[in-house]
A protein has these predicted regions:
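Surface-exposed recognition segments
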Residues: 79-92, 213-215, 230-240, 256-339
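Hydrophobic alpha-helical segments, especially N-terminal targeting/anchoring helices
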Residues: 46, 254-257
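Short loop/turn microsegments at loop-to-beta-strand junctions
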Residues: 61, 187-188, 248-251
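Short, compositionally biased
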Residues: 1-117, 171-172, 176-183, 203-206, ...
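Active-site microenvironments of metalloenzymes and redox enzymes
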Residues: 73-81, 91-219, 224, 228-229, ...
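Short, ordered coil/turn segments that flank beta-strands lining enzyme active or ligand-binding pockets
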Residues: 202, 250, 256
Length: 339
């Protein structure tokens, strides 16, 4: 798709092929710009609503602006089945930042893992080409002989998992992904702090889930054979699902509940006693390399209780499993990243 030549700047509107991922966007174009829309977003283009993207096609990494603000981090004592490690609730003031609209996908991971180190770049640990367990050989797909009663779930090796979130990624692997992305783009990509993650997940909500007091299997991917509060039972999918399949929260982020546990920067602490109030990662200066790191969000494998906005877990930084993935944040460091 090529922008029609015109005199001076103008605004162009594009309808994207995947409206779940982006509802549509407007961008300022020069008269000689060529814009290629293939799936999600356009390389290096900034949107006036606080959205920007790297790459093209299925590997597009869409980053959403998370506005500055403050919130009560942790769960209140009256929250159903809350744990002491989710408190004490404390007020946190955060600066704005960009966060990935979706968890990192298998296609995005493969793209970055395949990059060849260029002069001036310094890669760290090796990245497997695709560590995910749920590839086309293992993802169940629906087959039908023509009537709904004859539908069944089968494994036939034909599933396309490009848009499934990448899993079996350790904290070290997630950080190396951010390192390569930062060096290649000149921007500061990293994992979110625990405070950034919960603030973005809640998106102004104060309930156990950003959707309310409970959650249902049409809103997230978790083990819905169990319930939280008054929530109904439902389907247990037993695997990952494509990113963006479920509704976004109020700030446009998808898959913050369930899907995959997501790594955060912070070292693990048993409570929030002494936690930072500025949204920064809570790190132990003298910690060993194997000190546990934070995990948030729950996964496809878990009961809904684990998927609450305030629930916390941890893992050794070398830990990788079929229920662990990540998403990235980008920190504003100059005028080009201001929304």
């Amino acid at each position: 798709m090529t922008a029609t030549p015109a005199t001076g700047p103008r605004t162009a509107t594009f309808l994207l092929r995947q409206p779940r991922q982006v509802q549509g966007f407007r961008e300022q174009l020069r008269s000689d710009d060529e814009v290629f829309v293939e799936g999600v977003f356009v390389e290096g283009v900034f949107d006036q609503g606080g959205v920007f993207a790297e790459e093209q096609k299925k590997t597009a990494l869409t980053m959403l602006w998370i506005p500055p603000g403050r919130f009560w981090m942790g769960s209140p004592e009256e929250e159903l089945d809350r744990q002491d490690l989710e408190g004490p609730q404390h007020l946190v003031q955060l600066q704005g930042f960009f966060m990935g609209q979706m968890p990192i996908t298998q296609a995005q991971w493969r793209k970055v893992a395949a990059w060849v180190e260029q002069p001036g770049e310094q890669w760290g640990c090796e990245l497997k080409s695709n560590p995910a367990w749920f590839d086309g050989e293992k993802v169940k797909i629906w087959k039908s002989s023509g009537s709904a009663s004859d539908e069944s779930v089968v494994l036939d090796g034909s599933a396309n998992t490009d848009l499934h979130p990448v899993e079996q990624v350790s904290w070290h692997g997630a950080m190396e992904f951010c390192n390569r992305l930062s060096q290649r783009t000149g921007r500061h990509y990293t994992l979110p702090s625990e405070a950034q993650w919960e603030y973005a997940c809640r998106a102004g909500s104060t309930t156990p889930f950003h959707v309310g007091a409970t959650i249902t299997p049409d809103l997230a991917n978790y083990d819905a054979t169990t319930t939280y509060g008054d929530g109904p039972k439902g389907e247990y999918r037993e695997q990952t699902t494509p990113v963006g399949l479920f509704p976004a929260n109020a700030w446009g982020l998808h898959d913050m509940h369930g899907s995959l546990w997501e790594w955060c920067l912070d070292h693990w602490h048993d409570s929030y006693e002494g936690a930072p109030s500025d949204g920064s990662a809570w790190l132990m200066p003298s910690a060993s390399e194997e000190e546990p790191r934070l995990l948030r969000g729950g996964s496809w494998l878990d009961d809904p209780w684990y998927c609450r906005s305030a629930f916390r877990d941890r893992g050794r930084p070398g830990f990788a499993n079929v229920y662990v993935g990540f998403r990235v944040v980008c920190l504003p460091q100059g005028p080009s990243l201001n929304p």
